[in-house]
Design a protein with these regions (language model features):
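A glycine-biased structural micro-motif
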Residues: 278, 282-283, 355-365
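Catalytic alpha/beta core of large soluble enzyme barrels
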Residues: 225-227, 235-344, 373, 414
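Feature 926 captures the class I aminoacyl-tRNA synthetase adenylation module centered on the KMSKS loop
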Residues: 200, 438, 442-515, 519-521, ...
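Phosphate/diphosphate-binding loops
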Residues: 363-388, 880-884, 1015
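Amphipathic alpha-helical blocks
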Residues: 10-28, 269-283, 886-899
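Amphipathic alpha-helical
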Residues: 16, 158, 162-189, 194, ...
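N-terminal, positively charged nucleic-acid-binding surface of large information/translation enzymes
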Residues: 1-248, 321-334, 338-353, 377-420, ...
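Metal-dependent nuclease catalytic cores in nucleic-acid-processing enzymes
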Residues: 58-75, 326-337, 369-372, 550-566, ...
């Protein structure tokens, strides 16, 4: 028996146990098939999974299950990203550490061990969460970035880069986190709005009293490192004579910005005294505004230079600090400026910072502004809210500073990388052609070094004596005396002897953690230590991650792969979106809008969760809505009830499938089979194009709308026919075909329900394999698709729905038969469909006859839509009423007293029809019903009402479908005269008596009439 209610928890518990007890995953994985190399983008082992991580793994699991069911043997090794700041910062928080000094005091070895333990502990917890979502992966054999064979792949990659001249150490301005005291890649910087100072500063021009170049900055702390001013060569600049506080000043700035800047400085009177192009200002020298506070500045020349990156914004004169900005740095290198960086790793000024030495740079802003004000060099001071970069892990504001770092020369690879992007299949296409290409086109050399502890150590050793460099490309090159451990500080103890006799010691840096995952497509295969799997599988057939990975994992993989193999490491990339709340906001604890996967599973089950997240187009952001999630569960209940209905009757008749006999199929059977194959074809096409959302949507359209709400209603009378009736058997064969095929299609999406239905329903009526996942995804049988039949049935359903709408207007319930239904249409397709399926329309609309007419007697009545015109026209609405009276039809657009309105919105069109009729429109015509009832119709109506009540009472008594009863009705028997036998057959009553009731009795209100009904179970099921 199938339980009356769909219970996801019970189903999941049973299926989990079945899979585990019978090692179903292992049996499915053991099947031979074509190669399909999937690489799992490794999540950081930083804690519990969130909604987005869950969605990501469900997408992957669905695709892998589909591939297994379509003749492939996909790799399904889960990956774990276990190094880097994501782990370090979490461990620091656990230990209460604030700075790197705390780590070094605690001990690097001890800290690294804590990071290892933390990463492994979270890997285990997250594994259980993924398993809870029904994700089938090789959880016993994951790839982990902390394993020696994986770390070896990173070392080998850097060795290749070194051999190709693509690895270099250089001084460069980089993103820097002063809390973590390390360089960061662009992909590791998160931006959000922050308030900062916005100041306009006057730089005194040398040898020109009271003359100043005006600059603007939001980082006053970089002014101690100022080395130049940049202007645009072709921008027009002016020297302005201005009066302020009885003092004459001469200000140099961009002409088009002068008025707004002077207003900020509260200059009352001013005039332009000179005009020139930016290139004319080149070489103009100025005195550093803080040379007294930063004495080192007195030894350098400060002047104006040209730069194309300058724009006509703020003042048009840009303050240049080559030690604190990338464009500034590049200009400094070009012009031979000092790359001055008086800031240490902690973001604190060094002794070179003069007066500000020992101060954290951000804390120095106010003092620097005060000094400028005191020296009368502060033209204006404001606050600005702008997007500012923050460390992706500790969330501290970053700074820009020049430091010695190790770089991969992406600039030399960019052309090849862009060519390789074009060879990859991107889903959606614009993920590659637009988003990713834009990122790569603007990419700079990749800073791969990090000044941290928990990561893959850079395999670079440098001789202390002669500076000779050695890049180790394999862990086999390292002399080990004990257990192999490539992590710090053990690896730091390894010393090589240089040819010069000196000691070669490892540079202290570790890899950018994005480089770890960047080698995943070969590192996960232990290449190059082991080559067999790599040579069979690489490159990856498929990967999928969120759209943030265009500048993360997609990029790091492409860069590393082009270095090693001169080609992309993946063939197909599916880019998916983010999970947001229903208002489109990022989920965060501070907003209180975080939804955990477990919460959703608790309410709607694992299959409900999977189907809900998979309903959304993968590349769009998923706006989580509890209402929409619960709606999935409501639809699954409809699916369950449809299967339960089928199972109940088919098992009563001990049905066993023998295959479809086309000669016995009725029009509704052929239609649902056509719809099944259309769904099958659409699902197959969608899956081949990674459009998972289309499959889920089409499944519910088909199984809920077509099968449950339509086909089952059409065949209900047939299941009551004799056991061996060809009509009944054809219905059963059709139902079985639908359930069998539909659940094989949806199995990758809803594995628990599909497996349960397969084991408890499908296996009852045919010999089955041990698991639905040992079956094949069904190929579409296009010869069964009859598009004309589908189109005709669509017309019929529209007509039936219109008839239902007309009934509602007439207040006539569907159980009450009507004498006549008239269809007004000139559409030959509608006329043809009605003639072919007249019996279906009659049955579903509960009418005795149908007429088709080209035109029905009616009068068009037009009325203003006051809800629309009232707020718009107000007092003029009366005039609009008069205007409507002049119309014969609804115009497409209305121009009324200068206001343009849509006719269909401003005017309500209704028809006045003959007395006794009601109507409703459909897309190709109008349906009219004759609503008046005669005595014969009333008798049938009351009979149907009695049947419905008895059937409800049978359910309340929990009677089996085949059980017989005795029925007693306390009412005037003349009201249902002639319908007694019909009532008995429909309710399985062996007796129907009128008068005093007995047994289980209830009083009912039927159309205002109080009627008592009593029913009794017969002594045997056969009656």
């Amino acid at each position: 028996m199938i339980p009356a209610k769909y219970s996801p928890k019970d189903i999941e518990a049973e299926i989990f146990k079945f899979w585990d007890d019978n090692r179903i995953y292992e049996k499915v994985k053991a099947k031979e098939g074509k190669k399909f190399y999937f690489v799992d983008g490794p999540p950081y082992t930083t804690g519990r999974i969130h909604l987005g991580t869950a969605w990501n793994k469900v997408i992957k699991d669905t695709i892998l299950r589909y591939k297994r069911m379509t003749g492939f043997s996909p790799t399904d090794t889960p990956g774990w990203d276990m190094h880097g700041l994501p782990i370090e910062v979490k461990v620091e928080q656990e230990l209460g550490f604030k700075t790197k000094r705390d780590i070094e005091k605690y001990g690097i070895a001890e800290f690294v061990q804590k990071c290892m333990e933390y990463a492994l502990r979270n890997k285990d917890a997250m594994t259980e969460q993924f398993k809870m979502l029904g994700v089938w992966m090789d959880w016993e054999n994951p790839y982990m970035t902390i394993k020696a064979e994986y770390m070896n792949a990173a070392w080998w990659t850097i060795r290749i880069a070194y051999e190709k001249g693509l690895l270099e150490r250089k001084k460069m301005v980089v993103n820097w986190c002063p809390r973590c005291e390390t360089a960061l890649a662009d992909a590791e910087v998160e931006y959000w709005d922050e308030e900062d100072p916005s100041i306009y500063v006057k730089f005194p021009v040398k040898n020109e009293p009271n003359t100043y170049i005006v600059i603007w900055t939001t980082t006053p702390w970089t002014l101690p490192a100022n080395m130049a001013v940049a202007v645009h060569p072709s921008l027009e600049y002016v020297k302005i004579k201005a009066l302020k506080d009885d003092r004459i000043e001469y200000l140099i700035l961009a002409k088009e910005l002068a008025e707004s800047v002077l207003a900020k400085g509260d200059y009352k009177l001013w005039e332009i005294v000179e005009t020139y192009l930016g290139e004319d200002l080149v070489g103009l020298e100025y005195e550093h505004p803080l040379s007294d506070e930063v004495p080192l500045q007195k030894k350098w020349r400060h002047a104006v230079y040209i730069a194309d990156f300058v724009t006509a914004e703020n003042t048009g004169c840009v303050h240049i600090a080559p030690g604190h900005g990338l464009e500034d740095y590049e200009l400094g290198v070009k012009e031979g400026l000092e790359i001055f960086n008086p800031v240490d790793d902690r973001g604190v000024y060094t002794e070179e910072g003069g007066k500000y030495a020992g101060m954290f740079v951000k804390d120095a802003n106010d003092e620097i502004i005060e000094d400028l004000y005191r020296k009368e060099l502060l033209l204006a001071e404001e606050k600005i809210v702008h997007r500012y970069g923050h460390c992706w892990r500790c969330k501290s504001p970053i700074i820009y500073r020049s430091t010695e770092q190790w770089f991969l020369k992406i600039s030399k690879l960019k052309t090849l990388m862009l060519e390789e992007i074009d060879k990859v299949r991107w889903v959606p296409e614009w993920a590659g052609s637009a988003r990713f290409k834009d990122w790569v086109s603007n990419a700079k050399d990749w800073c791969i070094s990090r000044q941290r502890y928990w990561g893959i150590p850079l395999p670079i050793w440098i001789c202390e004596k002669c500076g000779e460099m050695k890049v180790v490309g394999s862990i086999n090159e390292v002399p080990w005396e004990s257990d192999l451990d490539l992590h710090r500080p053990k690896i730091d103890e390894v010393v090589f002897k240089c040819k010069c006799g000196g000691d070669m010691k490892r540079v202290p840096d570790v890899f950018d953690v994005w480089f770890d995952s960047g080698v995943a497509s070969w590192g996960s295969l232990a290449y190059p230590l082991e080559a067999d799997e790599f040579e069979k599988l690489w490159p990856a057939d498929f990967i999928t991650e969120g759209h943030d990975q265009t500048r993360g994992w997609f990029y790091s993989q492409l860069g590393a792969s082009v270095i090693c193999f001169s080609k992309a490491p993946y063939k197909t990339v599916l880019m998916h979106g983010f999970t947001l709340d229903e208002y489109g906001r990022k989920m965060s604890k501070s907003l209180g809008n975080v939804v955990e996967p477990e919460e959703v599973v608790e309410q709607i089950g694992v299959d409900g969760f999977r189907l809900y997240v998979l309903t959304s187009a993968p590349w769009e952001d998923l706006r989580f809505s509890w209402d929409e999630a619960r709606n999935i569960n409501r639809m699954l209940n409809i699916v369950w009830n449809a299967v339960r209905f089928a199972y109940t009757y088919m098992s009563i008749d001990k049905f066993k499938t023998k295959g479809l006999r086309s000669a016995d199929l009725k029009v509704e059977d052929k239609w649902i089979l056509s719809r099944l194959e259309s769904f099958n074809k659409e699902a197959y096409d969608a899956m081949e194009n990674y459009q998972l959302h289309r499959v889920v949507r089409k499944f519910f359209d088909f199984f809920v709308e077509d099968f449950s709400r339509w086909y089952i209603q059409l065949i209900r009378p047939r299941v009551w026919e004799e056991k061996d009736s060809p009509s009944k058997l054809a219905a059963y064969e059709t139902i079985f075909k639908v359930i069998d095929k539909a659940f094989r299609i949806i199995a990758p999406f809803a594995p628990f329900l599909s497996e349960w239905i397969y084991r408890h329903v499908i296996s009852e009526f045919k010999d089955c394999k041990e698991s639905i996942f040992l079956e094949s995804f069904p190929p579409p049988r296009e010869e069964f698709i009859d598009l004309e039949l589908e189109k005709n049935m669509e017309i019929v359903r529209e007509i039936v729905e219109a008839a239902s709408n007309a009934r509602q207007k007439a207040r006539r319930k569907l159980r009450w038969p009507l004498r006549k239904l008239i269809i007004e249409t000139r559409d030959e397709g509608v006329k043809s469909a009605v003639k072919k399926m007249e019996s279906i329309i009659k049955m579903q609309s509960n009418v005795k006859s149908i007429e088709i007419v080209n035109e029905f007697e009616k009068e068009l009545v037009l009325k203003p839509n006051y809800k629309v015109i009232g707020p718009l026209l107000k007092a003029r609405a009366k005039d609009f009423v008069e205007y409507v009276k002049t119309l014969k039809e609804v115009p497409e657009t209305i121009n009324f007293e200068g206001l343009e309105l849509k006719g269909s919105e401003a005017i309500i069109a209704e028809y006045k029809v003959p007395e006794g009729y009601e109507y409703a429109e459909f897309s190709r015509g109008i349906v009219y019903i004759y609503k008046e009832l005669d005595d014969e119709l009333r008798k049938e109506a009351y009979a149907r009402e009695i049947i419905r009540r008895i059937q409800e009472m049978r359910k309340e008594m929990d009677l089996d479908v085949e059980e017989f009863i005795e029925s007693y009705v306390e009412m005037d028997s003349k009201l249902i005269e002639g319908w007694e036998e019909y009532i008995k057959s429909e309710t399985r009553s062996i007796k129907l008596e009128f008068g005093e009731t007995t047994g289980y009795t209830k009083e009912w209100d039927i159309e205002g009439m109080k009627i008592k009904i009593g029913i009794k179970r017969c002594s045997s099921k056969s009656g």
